[in-house]
Amino acid sequence: AASDVYKRQIMYRSAQYAAKYGTVNKKKTDDGTEEEAKDEVLVRANGIPTYFAADIAYHYNKLATRGFAKAIDVWGADHHGHVARMKGAMDAIGLHGEDLDVVLMQMVNLMRDGQPVRMSKRTGNAITLTDLLEEVPIDSARFLFNMHDAGSGIDFDLDQAVKTDNDNPVYYVQYAHARICSILKKMESEGVAFAGAENIDATLLTEPSEMDLIRMLAAFPQEIVMAAEKYDPSRINRFVIDLASAFHRFYGSCRIQGA
């Protein structure tokens, strides 16, 4: 079986890893002192690979066997010390540690009335998305989780997530979208055609709010590129909130046909 092949490969390569990295028995602590550090075990005495060995096998399969150019892992921030070991293991088995990028995610605190809350007794200290979605609409959960970059802790406000006013950024953005759709539908029903960019008289664009909106729309493609390059999709959410704000200002200050 394929899993047995990878197991044998990792067991064989583990000797190379131990020879290269297993001699280090000291490590620096946060205060600059040294303490004993255990060698990383890849195969237990009973011959069963450890989770670390399975992780190495996964990356070997992804990069060497399936030919991906890069692996992007999403880990909890409490695994930050594992990053260097994984990159070192990849180097030891003939891969390249620099082909692994790791995004470290911080923990999420659920809040209600400004206080931490536990939603489920049956799941212990961990709260599943199933538990969360019993209280919060899925669109709110997706949007609010993705408003924060990976390195920031999240205080997820359950009260805010179910509001239907401008305090909830999900509602705020959806309201802008609904206004836009209403305008487009009205214009279509009245037979108003859209002029191409080459037919627009730019001298008529004089209101600050409409100029701000145009500038923001022009910046959107680059924002997508930046979000991809930095592995930070939260940039899109924050941009969309700013864009909705710019549209609401435009809507309030300019007369719009069909509105």
Question: Whereabouts are the PLM-identified features?
Answer:
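Non-catalytic interaction-recognition regions
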Residues: A1-A259
